[in-house]
Amino acid sequence: MKHKAVKELLRWSLMVFLSVSAVVAVSILMNGMYLLGIPDPEDVRSIVAEYPGVTDEKKEFTDREHVEQAVKLTGFLRYALFEEPVSGGSSMITITYVLDDGRTVSVSADRETVWWKGRPRAIKDREMFVNLAEGIFFLEEVSRP
């Protein structure tokens, strides 16, 4: 009796695992893969935002609101796993996270490609990251004629 209950539990666990795996795989294929390794907002001391096409000034933010927004902004950099990035582009916006331990982590993107850990990847939701970063960090510079 006990052996049969264990078999049923294992069978049920396998079905749950396979179902969850299928849902996650379809979600990644449809919506894109999140960047892995983005720091937690609590571990970030400050961020430096750069937009060379608009201003030569590097903007540093230490307030919690901008730090949290910068970390959350990377959620719009989901990339297509099996799509080749557009070649020949250069980054428009770079966000550098300065961590509490002094290390830095940078992510760069243009409208179609994200550069993360030295590798270019095709952005699934094009335009969104650049538009939001302009509005959050460079609104004054972008709105000038």
State where each predicted segment sits.
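Function-determining sites in protein domains
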Residues: 2-145
